């Protein structure tokens, strides 16, 4: 299979910068032989920062840039001169990116807004220069603080697409056809199952310049939540959707049963998915006359809005848009904060292996060569840092 440009999982090694050493310099001038300490503070190590960017919609740009390392802070110097702060490392990610610790599976953070910045790893604070430690009884301290050490972590970045409506259905249910009919998206469409191999997004225009975003994911089959088919990998892309549009073709042997199978797969994957608003669309309904529609109506699932549609003939499309817009704007449909559960590490590693993302990313770095002038052991307490 050709390598896809849609990358929603990537493993990267991150390392912040260590703080620069404080200086132990003693002031020495022609007419000031005993000038005392004037060593400056070390610079702060650079942070590793995630920044949301709506111009990205996959993690492809990170697949070949697996090491994110911030700069180290420089050492302080004479005349109480501060060392230069290390350069921050900013990682641009698409909105909807979730971060997990690759070793423990624990949730770390997520980025959902354009321009949102999250400090993933903090750089070490710079060490205090010796002038901070001058006292009445200690006029010439010949020690300074070392900078705080760097932090490092290997993380998994997982993309969960941000959309208002998520399309849910079996393969070949007409999801991609609907998306292409009501938006400018051009997903691959063919008369065989599993045509859609990766998620697609489309912006659906409504009235008065209003619009909403629709996401199409590969078809779900029974057992998808256990890893069958393509469903498991892509089910997470509808976790953030406000509303789920279930699509079942009119020629189904049992529409209610198919709906319950789909619902059960979502429940098994994440029980919270059942809290989302749902709409049912019976697709390919241009093959039905009104009499057949009337016969099918009583057999449909109860308690959710439904509509007969045909993406080819346009039957019911405007009604579907009205229903979706109404449901999206209900007060009960506002998404609450998503609870990100820890990942099963063994399952996570297997997914990474399947996608070729399981390579070791430990990075051997060289010493920054700050010199040995200030390389003195100093046991300091936390209060040494305060109010400095």
From Swiss-Prot:
GO terms for molecular function: GTP binding; GTPase activity; magnesium ion binding. NCBIfam families: Obg_CgtA, PRK12297.1, PRK12299.1. Its EC number is 3.6.5.-. Keywords: Cytoplasm, GTP-binding, Hydrolase, Magnesium, Metal-binding, Nucleotide-binding. This is GTPase Obg. Mg(2+) binds at residues 176, 196. The keyword GTP-binding applies. Residues 4-162 form the Obg domain.
């Amino acid at each position: 299979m050709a390598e896809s440009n849609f990358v929603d999982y990537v493993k990267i090694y991150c390392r912040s910068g260590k703080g620069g050493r404080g200086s132990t310099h003693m002031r020495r001038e022609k007419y000031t032989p005993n000038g005392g300490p004037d060593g400056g503070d070390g610079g702060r190590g650079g942070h590793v920062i995630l920044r949301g960017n709506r111009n990205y919609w996959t993690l492809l740009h990170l697949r070949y840039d697996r090491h994110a390392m911030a700069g180290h802070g420089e050492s302080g110097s004479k005349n109480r001169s501060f060392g230069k702060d290390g350069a921050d490392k900013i990682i641009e990610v698409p909105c909807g990116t979730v971060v997990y610790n690759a070793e423990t599976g624990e949730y770390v953070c997520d980025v959902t807004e354009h321009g949102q910045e999250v400090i993933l790893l903090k750089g070490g604070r710079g060490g205090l220069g010796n002038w901070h430690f001058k006292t009445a009884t200690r006029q010439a301290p010949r020690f300074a603080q070392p900078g705080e050490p760097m932090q490092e972590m290997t993380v998994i970045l997982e993309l969960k697409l941000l959309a208002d409506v998520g399309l849910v259905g079996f393969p070949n249910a007409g999801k991609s056809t609907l998306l292409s009919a009501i938006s400018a998206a051009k997903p691959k469409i063919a008369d065989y199952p599993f045509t859609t191999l990766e998620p697609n997004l489309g912006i659906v225009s409504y009235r008065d310049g209003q619009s909403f975003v629709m996401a199409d994911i590969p078809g779900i089959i029974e057992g998808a939540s256990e890893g069958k088919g393509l469903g498991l990998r892509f089910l997470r892309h509808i976790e953030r959707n406000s509303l789920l549009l279930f699509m079942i073709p009119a020629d189904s042997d049992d529409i209610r049963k198919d709906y319950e199978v789909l619902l059960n797969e979502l429940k098994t994957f994440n029980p919270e998915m059942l809290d989302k608003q749902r709409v049912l669309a019976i697709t390919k309904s241009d093959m039905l006359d009104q009499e057949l529609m009337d016969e099918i109506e009583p057999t449909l699932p109860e308690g959710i809005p439904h509509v007969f549609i045909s993406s080819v003939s346009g039957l019911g499309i405007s009604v579907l848009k009205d229903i979706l817009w109404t449901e999206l704007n209900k007060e009960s449909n506002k998404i609450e904060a998503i609870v990100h559960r820890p990942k099963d590490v063994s399952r996570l590693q297997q997914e990474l292996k399947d996608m070729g993302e399981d390579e070791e990313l430990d990075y051997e770095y060289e010493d920054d060569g700050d010199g040995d002038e200030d390389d003195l052991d100093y046991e300091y307490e936390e209060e040494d840092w305060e109010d400095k």
